[in-house]
Amino acid sequence: MKRLFWALAAALMMFAPAALAQTAQEITDTCTLSAVGKKTLGRMTDGQYQTYWASSSGSYAYVEIEAEESVGGLYVQFYEDIAALEVQTTDDAGAWQTVAVSGGSFLNEYIALDAGAETVRIRPKDGKGRLFIAELHIFGEGDAPDWVQQWEAPLDKADLLALAAHPDDELLFLGGTIPYYAGEMGRKVQVAYLVPTMPYRRLELLDGLWLCGVKNYPMIGHFPDKYQLTLKGMYAQKGWSRESVYRFVAETYRACRPDVVVTQDVNGEYGHGAHRAVADAAQAAIALAADEKYQEKMTHSEPWQVKKLYLHLYEQNPVKMDWRKPLAAFGGQTAFDLASRAFECHISQQRTDYHVEDFGPYDNSKFGLAYSSVGEDVQKDDFFENLE
């Protein structure tokens, strides 16, 4: 009997933390913020990614938070210039001491505080540099809510790479690819873009990817946002040489080592040159990434062989995906539903005429197998056919 008692007691102790865990409540509205540049402090809490607070430099680059209850976590959304942060509280003598440090790798960073305090400040690590913060969310004690993004590093071994020219192209033209494979099927999905566009659009894309079940931070290229109708015209643009685009995509293949790549239309969907370029480079980079001799300015020198490449609207070896199936991982919502909701996260793009559509001329459920080292598809309804 004693043995049974202690076994039950041990089990209760094991599960007690999980049972007692609670979701932290946001307390931002009840906090007082202070900093140099206080006239624009409200921009950090206005819910708008297109506005931001910029600090002074050096010792004045900080935000001080005065809360009415213990602060259990901070969610910082940088506008640009990601900074490693120190979170500080005061000791008994009133001196600032560092209690947590962020990694400084992602635009959105959540910093949990083990020892809650009502007076907290954040500053660049070692007190150097400036801060550019779009939004700051302050939480009481408890676990961060699910909507708070806690990113992991980009994958070094992906199952699938969703490769897009611009933020939102991965939803408009790749449809339910990301929510279906990342969220429902539990595949390791890496997302990459050629064009970073405006800083606020990068925050929008992160919201959309998180909603779709992506946990690994996207890879974002450096190509300027240009518009041309032809592939030749695109490659003639400054910063868009054919060689540099090929190199970036080949480097991406080697970095995340995907088995499957899904990308855009060789005709650029509605004719966009950057869309044409990403489809062109996706094909050319397969051989480059696998070539041991191709080392031109490459950080990742180990060759990688992509097994399958799917292009949007590609007419050869066509594949028709069903994005309308209910997904258990999302409570019965479909991949189409999730892609549509994720596109709504791109608030700055809602004034355009673009919509997530699995019908019409840009049907995002239609793809073609442009390359395969594992044979042609037979079922034609799964990007991982012949890879299981």
Residue spans for each PLM region:
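Short Gly/Thr/Asp-enriched flexible loops that form oxyanion-binding sites at enzyme active sites
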Residues: 270-286
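Active-site rim/loop-helix segments in enzyme catalytic domains that contact anionic ligands
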Residues: 81, 109-111, 115-255, 283-287, ...
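Proline-aspartate-enriched helix->loop->beta-strand connector
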Residues: 249-269
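Extracellular carbohydrate recognition and processing domains
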Residues: 97-113
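The feature marks non-catalytic terminal segments
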Residues: 24, 28-43, 49, 151-152, ...
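Positively charged n-region of N-terminal signal peptides that target proteins for export
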Residues: 1-4
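Disordered, acidic Ser/Thr/Pro-rich linker "stalks" and the adjacent N-terminal cap
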Residues: 19-70, 79-85, 89-91, 147-150
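Bacterial N-terminal signal peptides
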Residues: 7-16
